[in-house]
């Protein structure tokens, strides 16, 4: 294969071709061609639309697709021609935008100044900052890159839990980085993902249209392919900035584009790519990608969805949802925790949460609880409330200023949630998967007071049908349930607590990181999955 022409950064259409270095890393045949500018191209140096790729064959000059159209109509032919043309555009564009940092250890060497690739004297390849790419030096700390986005608090919480588990289990053997790939490494409007999510969630109809409208494979695959044409270079730079040995996605939008980039440069054998799903039951189809090394599912329900999406059994592990390692530590006595939090040491307590942003009917529920947990005949409280307002300082200030008839503690953003849960007897929260998993580990019966359509909808029957809690959107009904649990229905509270403990998986995060450690250790012998995106 002839080396591509040297192109300076000032060129209007820079092209970076590393196939001399990538020879031997992939089993697919490559055939160079030329575009109208005279640059050397390669059929595999592209991000493919819905799994399409052009095969250089004298007999077959047509574009083949993993997705077949079972129609001979003119409409079907037109659609196939459109997709073929669009795929050619993606291939032409992406050959010019994937950055120099994507260099892999290969069988054919280049001079030290070709395409910005430098060697370290031992046959390894150095990246932009002179650091060896993954797999080059066995003595260096292995690097883990966790991809997340602040669309809700659960993704960051899972990322932090995984990082803490790596640090606790392996110490300096791993360096763990967390990045919001879209916000930190892509241009406008792609870097507005968290803001867009928050807007859509606040407008339920728009969110439902977005969630269910993008569920079909042909829709979201087409969307990712089109998006790749604009941000492939930025995504590649964002990934290789860290020179990762492991890439972990804890967000449904953090695998398709990165995997396309890695595949286009032949790095799927070099980097272990895993997905840690953070939805307990229902989850968006974008969570699943056939090219991942491993897909960690929190429940058998999610594992079944993964298999239906085409993942092999060997790719799927069901360990549970990763929660902070601090939740695995022995529970301190309730009296001690309540004393530290300024709570009454003897009264039963309910934990009222609204997520990291303090959303939901917290004030209305708190007022209803204050009435229900006050015995007018005795003139005293029969329960107490611990309210977590998250980052909602306005709500925290308002609730703190009220005169309550029962003991009420109002807190802002909390980092030691395990202590707050350990001090209480039950919890009221929206159906966020992370909070549910943490509550189960602490054996707290759960009252769900809301959910986000789509990904959180399945969490409600998951809790209710497993006998771990109840669901109601009515503050008055919720307060009655709590009052009954603290009184005549105390036996039900105890049974639900036992059910929650039975369903809990506190060791999930440790099982996940140890499995990843084994994947890295064996990565040179792992077979590469041969399938389309």
Curated annotation (Swiss-Prot):
Stretch list, region Required for binding to diacyl glycerol: 192-215
Keyword Transit peptide: yes
Tissue spec: Expressed in roots, stems, leaves, flowers, siliques and seeds.
EC number(s) stated in the UniProt entry for this protein: 2.4.1.46
Coiled-coil ranges (or none): none
Phenotype upon changing residue 287 to A: Abolishes enzyme activation by phosphatidylglycerol (PG), and reduces enzyme activation by phosphatidate (PA)3-fold
Protein name per UniProt: Monogalactosyldiacylglycerol synthase 1, chloroplastic
The species this protein was found in: Arabidopsis thaliana
